[in-house]
Amino acid sequence: MDAKTQAKYEARAKIIKSMAHPTRLFIVDELARTGERCVWELTEMVGVDMSTVSRHLAMLKNVGIIEDEKRGSQVYYSLRCRCATDFFECVESVMKCNAKDQQKLLAS
């Protein structure tokens, strides 16, 4: 693999890795559903402390999945690329395929 191809796959892996936590998946799903949320809203919804939610948001922002906008004393987060929800559809398809395979094994 040449350096350009390697860099492309490393960038992809970094983005996918940023989604590899249930809380971050929830945040992305919630932002896709509602359009935007501020930190305290997400903190209440997730049920963990604000610093933990802030770390999750920072990771998602760092790879370009979400963006923020400061309004007064609040910071609102939204999806930067709505195509992030396509990732969920792909994951759901894989889960369905896996479930079908598991059912076939159990039926054997």
Locations of the language-model features?
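N-terminal helix-turn-helix DNA-binding core of bacterial DNA-binding proteins
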Residues: D2, A7-S51, R71-R82
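Alpha-helical residues within the helix-turn-helix
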Residues: E44, K61-N62
